[in-house]
Swiss-Prot record:
<comment type="subunit">
    <text>Oligomer of 24 subunits. There are two types of subunits: L (light) chain and H (heavy) chain. The major chain can be light or heavy, depending on the species and tissue type. The functional molecule forms a roughly spherical shell with a diameter of 12 nm and contains a central cavity into which the insoluble mineral iron core is deposited. Interacts with NCOA4.</text>
</comment>
<dbReference type="GO" id="GO:0005506">
    <property type="term" value="F:iron ion binding"/>
</dbReference>
<keyword id="KW-0968">Cytoplasmic vesicle</keyword>
<dbReference type="InterPro" id="IPR009040">
    <property type="entry name" value="Ferritin-like_diiron"/>
</dbReference>
<dbReference type="GO" id="GO:0031410">
    <property type="term" value="C:cytoplasmic vesicle"/>
</dbReference>
<feature type="domain" description="Ferritin-like diiron">
    <location>
        <begin position="7"/>
        <end position="156"/>
    </location>
</feature>
<protein>
    <recommendedName>
        <fullName>Ferritin light chain</fullName>
    </recommendedName>
</protein>
<dbReference type="GO" id="GO:0008198">
    <property type="term" value="F:ferrous iron binding"/>
</dbReference>
<keyword id="KW-0409">Iron storage</keyword>
<feature type="binding site">
    <location>
        <position position="57"/>
    </location>
    <ligand>
        <name>Fe cation</name>
    </ligand>
</feature>
<dbReference type="GO" id="GO:0006826">
    <property type="term" value="P:iron ion transport"/>
</dbReference>
<feature type="binding site">
    <location>
        <position position="54"/>
    </location>
    <ligand>
        <name>Fe cation</name>
    </ligand>
</feature>
<feature type="binding site">
    <location>
        <position position="64"/>
    </location>
    <ligand>
        <name>Fe cation</name>
    </ligand>
</feature>
<dbReference type="GO" id="GO:0044754">
    <property type="term" value="C:autolysosome"/>
</dbReference>
<feature type="binding site">
    <location>
        <position position="58"/>
    </location>
    <ligand>
        <name>Fe cation</name>
    </ligand>
</feature>
<dbReference type="GO" id="GO:0008199">
    <property type="term" value="F:ferric iron binding"/>
</dbReference>
<dbReference type="InterPro" id="IPR008331">
    <property type="entry name" value="Ferritin_DPS_dom"/>
</dbReference>
Amino acid sequence: MTSQIRQNYSPEVEAAVNHLVNLHLRASYTYLSLGFYFDRDDVALEGVSHFFRELAEEKREAAERLLKMQNQRGGRALFQDVQKPSQDEWGKTLNAMEAALALEKNLNQALLDLHALGSAHTDPHLCDFLENHFLDEEVKLLKKMGDHLTNIRRLSGPQASLGEYLFERLTLKHD
């Protein structure tokens, strides 16, 4: 059944929004895995755990925001299987933050691709929505993760475990 409110909302954009929803849910699932990995008794980095669990919640909320926009435009939400995280053991904070940065770069590229698709289909509502709710937030998160990686690398070396502990205590307790 077609929507009675649908106007200037191309099937390609609708499919790309559904794909982006899936990417956000996958990111949320990955961050949940990361968060609870760092919460384990043999890892015990509470600040790192909290950082990733907050990201899991933010990505789930972003998926819901996209789904709400999809409905408002007369599109249909088509749910896909959410791929499990690429691993269960994340190693050190450095490895986890590198994986998270790669994930965010992938999400950012998908957002940019959707924005370009919206522009190509002359969809100002979609472009405005992405600019106001996603693009700036994503750039800020990429910068924050890059800064965290720089600081983690500074603390790496012969006593990397101490550096990881200090990073967690001095940086993530204040996020």
